[in-house]
Amino acid sequence: MSKIIGIDLGTTNSAVAVLEGTESKIIANPEGNRTTPSVVSFKNGEIIVGDAAKRQAVTNPETVISIKSKMGTSEKVSANGKEYTPQEISAMILQYLKGYAEDYLGEKVEKAVITVPAYFNDAQRQATKDAGKIAGLEVERIVNEPTAAALAYGMDKTDKDEKILVFDLGGGTFDVSILELGDGVFDVLATAGDNKLGGDDFDQKIIDFLVAEFKKENGIDLSQDKMALQRLKDAAEKAKKDLSGVTQTQISLPFITAGSAGPLHLEMSLSRAKFDDLTRDLVERTKTPVRQALSDAGLSLSEIDEVILVGGSTRIPAVVEAVKAETGKEPNKSVNPDEVVAMGAAIQGGVITGDVKDVVLLDVTPLSLGIETMGGVFTKLIDRNTTIPTSKSQVFSTAADNQPAVDIHVLQGERPMAADNKTLGRFQLTDIPAAPRGIPQIEVTFDIDKNGIVSVKAKDLGTQKEQHIVIKSNDGLSEEEIDRMMKDAEANAEADAKRKEEVDLKNEVDQAIFATEKTIKETEGKGFDTERDAAQSALDELKAAQESGNLDDMKAKLEALNEKAQALAVKMYEQAVAAQQAAQGAEGAQANDSANNDDVVDGEFTEK
């Protein structure tokens, strides 16, 4: 089998690795660098990728950076006189990585394992897979970045049982995963994250500071000058990196713009203390996902054996100190944070080809999945942090008599009401035979494959007719939305519970009215008029309460109706039992007569 390369398709930088024997090796790019900037530029119809594209970003406005942040959305970028989807731009980066991997290996590369942030949703994962296809790669597996990092870290520790926390702060995303390692099994216990937090945000804080200081001194807003802004971005990134090794750095940008008196220059010094102050809120945001992942995994900090740092942004001293303070542990520095994800992806490629033996990777889905049910309730079928691949089915029914079709509204999120979660897709199951509500049996099945990509099937168990959909959303879940889902779920827990209680009560009332009306109709002319009249009276009162919308009144009248309906049901049961006993008595008498007749024997009498 041909080699399967491992690719870390990052926001700011990407890397490619391959398994050589039992070792995972990073492949250097044509410029000798072990990581490649995730930058694409267009010049005179030529596509330029990587270091060369990044170098000309200041002077070439047709340069695309951080395209990963747009994956899974319908947003396009304009360049080279065309409009490109995020998948197409990402494919250009993948093609470049594939090309120099082929040069190194001396053979054609057709298959890859590509990593994504653990908190990437279905649309973003599908977009990544599509980008691979456009680049001419068969994507054998989509692997979560922290999981790939754990795979690379733990490959030489398969005889050791330990629980690790992977802290992955990259250029545009942040993930935390808790894994249990032992006997070659890499089991993800929980994952959490913030898809709108990364090194780019730290750069932006410096840019905003420089723009504000320059405006204060010169009265000119550099953020309105596209070329000046690109120079500021480059300077901010360099300053951030410098401050990981020194306590102060000088930012010098001559001829940044021109004023009425002539050219203006930006000269400023930035201390690590000032940088820490500017980015304090970003560092603070890393703490919540750490706590969330630990809580979901059901572990305390004392049960974590190692903390692994992944992503270039974990070199920021304030981030390292925050990790120490939050976990109470010195981070393990045995892996290269820029390379470990691609190396883990290559190891997974080796698992697929059979070159790596006795390794099992058990990943999870980051958010709950389900459908909208009556009253706008979000009914979960698969909970977050469920090991994938997985499949779950549940039977639902119709909400009205003779309902010919059901709409299946597929959602992703953590809130109890459908409106507060993210729509992944909708489809319809039609031609349901006419029947009273609650009679048709509609089985809804969710499947999540090994790549975390969702497919949903609805089947009428009566007719065996089914509809199937692979979720392909054009506007995937944004980073803010994922973060908001988790935070809103906590902040609005009380309000959510109340709203759900209201919907549940209304559904219960609706069901009770339907069932009681049916019982009253079925018992017409069968006696026990007293109980029927009492049930009818309670039914009328509940309908009036339902009309008024008063929840307390509805609750009280529902209890009263249940009591009267129960009394009617008891009478029906007693009548049925009496009828059954009477029937059994009649059968018994008939059997006795037959038995008595059997005792009579005809015989001859002889007189002596």
Swiss-Prot record:
Positions carrying Phosphothreonine: T173
Region (Disordered): 580-608
Stored CDD domains: ASKHA_NBD_HSP70_DnaK-like
Pfam families (UniProt xref): HSP70
UniProt key word Phosphoprotein: yes
Keywords in alphabetical order: ATP-binding, Chaperone, Nucleotide-binding, Phosphoprotein, Stress response
Sequence ranges of Acidic residues compositional bias: 599-608
Described purpose of this protein according to its UniProt entry: Acts as a chaperone.
Record family assignment: Belongs to the heat shock protein 70 family.
Protein name stated in the entry: Chaperone protein DnaK
Organism encoding this protein: Streptococcus pyogenes serotype M28 (strain MGAS6180)
